[in-house]
């Protein structure tokens, strides 16, 4: 039976959400390893300036001090740095990417919305109040009614930019702030363990930069997805999970990237690589960093 989207259902959704939170530990796999691919793209306004693709293994162990461990197997990356700009971008790390901050039952308003599958609930949330810097959140959760497991989660910024302050780079007049961000995670159930794990994650961040001459935006998009079922396997960690993603240093394998089909080069990215090739010898104006 298909339920059509219709009016808002008003109820005690905050109490229901607390029950969902109480089941998280039982619903999620505690210790497992998966294979993953990750794409990291940075644009300055609409122009791509960074491409980074990774493949590897991720171990998640909630009982360990290092809850996440990463073994990178393959990487290709390139960055086109315009020296006259004099501004670089700090990327997220694996801990920040994987971190899931649940909306507070007491700090948010929750509203159940009719969903197109009667086996699930969709509950939207938003901050009751923004803080003094204009920061708030909004988003939704999709929940399996049978076991109270979260199968989809999206959280976005809800910011009053009139109140949002700028930060400054040290010894510089350049200032910056983050007016927009969002994170979208999907979970599926592992057949063997009958528990859930995140199968895909997308994170987008928009950073506003203001100099004495102009203002512009950096737009960073990170996509991480799994390509295997969870398994019991020890990995050999070779990259710190609290380190800027782009600081990873691994040898490029042309054979691997030509044969894989998980992260194809779009026309836009292919044009970016051609642009890098055209400008890589203009060392006075540009600096190219990469492994291929």
Which residues make up each language-model segment?
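Surface-exposed, low-complexity/disordered segments
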Residues: 2-121, 166, 174-292
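Feature captures eukaryotic membrane-trafficking machinery centered on endolysosomal pathways
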Residues: 120-169, 175-190
């Amino acid at each position: 039976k298909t339920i059509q989207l219709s009016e808002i259902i008003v109820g005690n959704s905050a109490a229901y959400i607390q029950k969902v939170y109480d089941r998280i530990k039982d619903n999620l796999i505690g210790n497992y390893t998966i294979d993953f691919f990750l794409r990291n793209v940075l644009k300055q306004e609409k122009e791509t300036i960074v491409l980074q693709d990774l493949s590897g293994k991720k171990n998640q162990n909630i009982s360990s001090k290092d809850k996440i461990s990463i073994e990178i197997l393959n990487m290709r990356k390139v960055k086109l740095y315009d020296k006259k700009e004099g501004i670089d971008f700090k990327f997220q790390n694996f801990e920040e990417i994987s971190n899931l901050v649940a909306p507070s039952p007491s700090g948010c308003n929750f509203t159940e919305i009719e969903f197109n599958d009667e086996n699930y609930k969709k509950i939207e949330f938003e901050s009751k109040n923004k803080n003094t810097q204009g920061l708030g959140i909004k988003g939704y959760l999709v929940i399996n009614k049978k076991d109270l497991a979260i199968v989809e989660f999206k959280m976005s910024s809800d910011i009053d930019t009139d109140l949002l302050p700028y930060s400054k780079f040290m010894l510089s007049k350049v200032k910056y702030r983050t007016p927009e961000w969002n994170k979208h995670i999907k979970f599926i159930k592992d057949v063997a363990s009958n528990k859930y794990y995140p199968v895909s994650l997308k994170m987008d961040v928009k950073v506003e930069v203001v100099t004495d001459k102009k203002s512009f935006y950096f737009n960073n998009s990170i996509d991480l997805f799994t390509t295997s079922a969870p398994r019991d396997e020890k990995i050999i960690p070779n990259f710190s999970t609290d380190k800027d993603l782009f600081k990873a240093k691994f040898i490029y394998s042309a054979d691997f990237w030509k044969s894989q089909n998980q992260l194809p080069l779009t026309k836009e990215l292919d044009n970016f690589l051609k642009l890098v090739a055209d400008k890589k010898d203009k060392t006075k104006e540009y600096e190219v960093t990469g492994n291929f």
